């Protein structure tokens, strides 16, 4: 265990650190997720001109949501700090649509303390579900969708548009690849055709907001 993470200045090989366990196990290195969306102006002022979005073990929805939001925040801030600050609620709402474990600023403003870790749970917060990615269209104008999670006819789905905007559409009909109607799409990675009543471009990601 790194001593800097538990309050000591240097590591000593024969020094033991107490580890506590409950009926669900331990929560060693159970860090909150890094979130610097509220400090883009300070990052740019510091001369940083490249940010890395961590994508390992993440879904395409997570990477698309985070990368798109930071890209828009950076562009807005470079246009004017006032515009960036005025859109802060939008950035924070978008980041919160990812699956996450509370937020921290990590080591950006100095050493972390006990508030950067989670000690009583390993539960993720989930506000949106990844529905699928548009792969094409058929002759009827239905969207060919690689489905990721179950959804049903009549549900409202949110389309992520690369410019940072979102659009809500309603599932009017679902068909399998052979044209047979379906009331819901329960099988992950199934290729299906969906009628949203309007065109959705290939490559766009779809998600559903979860009620709280």
Residue ranges and their predicted role:
Residues 1-7, 11-12:
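Single conserved hydrophobic/aromatic residue that forms the stacking wall/gate
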Residues 16-24:
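Gly-rich Lys/Arg/Thr-decorated short loops/hinges at beta-loop-alpha junctions or inter-strand turns
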Residues 24-70:
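Long hydrophobic segments that form regular secondary structure
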Residues 39-40, 58, 120-121, 132-133, ...:
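Generic recognition of flexible, low-complexity loop/linker segments
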Residues 54-129:
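Anionic-ligand-binding alpha/beta catalytic cores of soluble enzymes and soluble regulatory domains
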Residues 129-212:
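Beta-strand/loop-dominated core regions that host nucleotide or nucleotide-derived cofactor-binding catalytic loops
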